[in-house]
A protein has these predicted regions:
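Acidic, Ser/Thr- and proline-rich intrinsically disordered linker/docking segments
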Residues: 1-24, 29-33, 54, 75-150
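Glycine/small-residue-rich phosphate/adenosyl-binding loop
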Residues: 36
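Polybasic phosphoinositide-binding surfaces of eukaryotic membrane-targeting domains
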Residues: 57-71
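The phosphoinositide-binding surface of pleckstrin homology
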Residues: 39-54
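Flexible glycine-/small-residue-rich
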Residues: 47, 66, 73, 108
Length: 150
């Protein structure tokens, strides 16, 4: 699978042009720096994190790899925001549709966050990708626990 996060973001935005996102190349570079050589990018999307306002300050790139979930946002003046979440920390997610845009609320053990400004057409693909990711990772976790108990 393609490891180029920016290219994956561009494909997502081309497929779903109603998604709100600014400075995509800068935000993608935050994630690109943190992807390890042995990781494979499974799914990438982009939206506005934890805000109901549509501003360039909150655009965030979300990447699912074969090992973890990554969130990255490039702030101004050289600062950046980066979060890495392992699959065992993910609980569930919720899809919401509004009048013009959709949103996804992802719940983890420590926090939950909302990604807004998503094209309503993109929600089905995002839901399918996150569901498959969660199911596959939970199966791996259960198998590992079973093997360690034996």
């Amino acid at each position: 699978m393609n490891r180029d996060v920016y290219e994956n973001c561009r494909k997502f935005l081309k497929k779903y042009p109603g998604t709100i996102a600014w400075r995509v190349k800068k935000h993608a570079s935050v994630i690109q720096r943190h992807i390890n050589d042995d990781e494979v990018v499974l799914y990438t999307f982009i939206g506005q994190k934890d805000t109901m306002l549509i501003q360039p300050f909150f655009t965030t790139v979300i990447v699912f790899t074969n090992k973890r979930m990554l969130l990255g946002r490039k702030k101004y003046l050289g600062r950046s925001f980066y979060t890495s979440i392992t699959p065992d920390m993910l609980n569930d997610f919720e899809i919401r549709t509004g009048l013009f845009f959709g949103s996804i609320e992802i719940d983890t053990v420590k926090e939950h966050f909302i990604i807004n400004g998503l094209s309503k057409k993109s929600l089905g693909e995002i839901e399918d990708s996150i569901s498959k990711y969660l199911i596959n990772e939970k199966i791996k976790i259960l198998k590992n626990r079973k093997e360690t108990n034996e």
